[in-house]
Swiss-Prot record:
It comes from Rhodopseudomonas palustris (strain BisB18). Induction: By stress conditions e.g. heat shock. This is Chaperone protein DnaK. The keyword Metal-binding does not apply. It comes from the Bacteria. The modification Phosphothreonine is found at residue 198. InterPro entries: ATPase_NBD (IPR043129), Chaperone_DnaK (IPR012725), Heat_shock_70_CS (IPR018181), HSP70_C_sf (IPR029048), HSP70_peptide-bd_sf (IPR029047), Hsp_70_fam (IPR013126). It holds the Pfam family HSP70. Acts as a chaperone. GO terms for molecular function: ATP binding; ATP-dependent protein folding chaperone; unfolded protein binding. Keywords: ATP-binding, Chaperone, Nucleotide-binding, Phosphoprotein, Stress response. Belongs to the heat shock protein 70 family.
Amino acid sequence: MGKVIGIDLGTTNSCVAVMDGKAPKVIENAEGMRTTPSIVAFSDDGERLVGQPAKRQAVTNPERTFFAVKRLVGRRYDDPMVEKDKKLVPYKIVKASNGDAWVEADAKTYSPSQVSAFILQKMKETAEAHLGAKVDQAVITVPAYFNDAQRQATKDAGKIAGLEVLRIINEPTAAALAYGLDKAKAGVIAVYDLGGGTFDVSILEIGDGVFEVKSTNGDTFLGGEDFDMRLVSYLADEFQKEQGINLRNDKLALQRLKEAAEKAKIELSSTTQTEINLPFITADQSGPKHLTMKLTRAKFEALVDDLVQKTIEPCRKALKDAGLTAGEIGEVVLVGGMTRMPKVQEVVKQLFGKEPHKGVNPDEVVAIGAAIQAGVLQGDVKDVLLLDVTPLSLGIETLGGVFTRIIERNTTIPTKKSQVFSTAEDNQNAVTIRVFQGEREMAADNKILGQFDLMGIPPSPRGMPQIEVTFDIDANGIVNVSARDKATGKEQQIRIQASGGLSEADINKMVKDAEINAAEDKKRREAVDAKNHADALVHTTEKALAEHGAKVEEGERRAIEDALGDLREALKGDDAEAIKAKSNTLAQASMKLGEAMYKQQAEADAAKDAAKDDVVDAEFTEVDDDKPKKSA
């Protein structure tokens, strides 16, 4: 078995590491750098450039230079965040045949997985040159908040690059592995990971070689690229005020602004003022124009303050989900290049009440952790156990459009859970299983991952068939769902495929809006529950009335029929209180019917007892009260 490498496939930069004996080692690329820009370009003659060579020619070739493509992985073309990106990047983002966002150069389109694969190939070649041997297996990191489709797309990228991806590992978890491998001290740590394109926070408990993730949260569209773009917008606005020329219409100028913004951002982490100087940025009838501007750290911090503040809420939610307070966190580990920014460090210190740990290299720590996990899988690293979690709840749509969770968020993976559901109609011979991911009460408000049909259910009254739905999440966080009719043994399963990722509006909407809209969600959920209860009451009352209606007086029967009519009418609307009231009226009216049924049964039993000489003790068996839930 050859060496298994660890790769941090980043939005802005990527890094590769390998276990060198007992210690992980970051490998330098052909340019002598320990990190490689996650940039792919195509030259005039069609040559593909990756990394530093691609970055060097970006200013003169902006339309064929792809950067930050990781942010498009698993995203739909009509995603609001893609719309935003389209206005800011100089290259062309196009709509693929499946509705995903792809990129285009020289009339040829590339999926984000393909572009990621070009970067992975570069990392693979870097490792092979260092090791002097072929490499075909890797552990690749992804943001903790990546969904199933995005993880699958990352595995696909590895495959395209000629790598068997042994494990997909979350970036904050990898960082924790690197931080805690040689530390004997047990405790709880928080990993604050603000990278080039994504933000993650994970709370972990470390002790005796066990790294257990307690909770995770994040934002898949928040990172250094947003800070750069905020500064680009400011520079473009200021230039337009002074010169009356909109640089956003000039792709060459836009690329120069992007490079200048990134450079200024980095410089302002170690100095309080920098100068941006871009001669001949554009020209008009009066001649060439130059952009010269002094930028202070205070001004830059004011421009991006809301972006820094956006990291606070996910941290609070992660603490809440872990059942911990900020004071119970022993150490805060900073990961990602953006954590070098003094303002970010200040916010982290205020939030957790302690100085963050700066003993790890934020650009390399994730790749080092991936290499350690590779060593664990290869057997080179002993006594290390990694227990990660799934970031969002998974479940199916049930009667009335309700989202029924089968696996809750922050459940340790790998995991497998089943739940029994039933049919909603008499003689229903098929059910559609619609799989969702999110935190809202109604399925439609969450992200649909896929759907499939279970056919051939034997004709029977509703509520009778038992359909067992099983969710299986592997250690990579990739989902398999199966449904089985317990009576016939017929089974259907689906591996959720990457048909488009969770957008910013989708992912964050799931968790953030869940709290904002909690009251509305509760109201809608109550309405559905009331309807389901009322529907069942109508069904059982109609059946009882047909079988035993003759045993009650005419006036009582008419009262039941009137109450039935009123409830049916109420069911046409969505007023939960009205449905509950009409349900109670019907339940009261039906009591006489129930009494008549019990009376008849009691008389029959008495007749049987009279015919017997001996009294025989009854045998009791325990009955499971859990009735199957109804599925659409």
